[in-house]
Amino acid sequence: MIPARVVAGLALALGLLSGSAVSADDLMPMDTSGVDPDMLKSMYGPWVIADESGGKRCNVVLTDEPTIGGSVIHVDPACEKTFPVMADIAAWRLMTNWGIDLADAERKTRIRFTTPDNAYVAEPETDGIFTILQPEE
């Protein structure tokens, strides 16, 4: 029989060997209680969802108004013609590491945007959606 402390030590060692980087699958809803309010405000407002070329675009508005499954998202009615999955989007969530989840009415994440570099990238790329960005002023 293997002592519990050996099993715990092996589990810890394996966890350390597997890397400490947080993957997109590990993201959790962000605890915004300690976040600078101005940083949070910068997340709210108009955004553009686009394909990789930027030729296909869809306008959304992310709000701070709570709803079932996250916060209210206003999706331009024309979006579902450009990106059919947008017809199912009912909420958005701010995730750790400033990720953005778009969720359906059953609270299932349909698209997750993360920032591996300096721009948001969709995971998975659905209906050609590649990124979400704030419109240039």
Regions found by a protein language model. Give the residues of each.
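Contiguous, well-ordered beta-strand patches that form the walls/edges
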Residues: 74-115
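C-terminal partner/receptor-binding element of secreted or periplasmic proteins
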Residues: 116-137
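Bacterial N-terminal signal peptides that target proteins for export
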Residues: 1-10
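Structural signal for glycine-centered tight turns and loop->strand junctions in beta-sheet-rich domains
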Residues: 66-68, 98
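Sec/Tat signal peptide C-region and signal peptidase I cleavage site
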Residues: 20-24
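Tryptophan-anchored aromatic micro-motifs
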Residues: 25-58, 94
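General beta-strand recognition
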Residues: 48, 59, 99-101, 121
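Bacterial N-terminal signal peptides
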Residues: 9-18
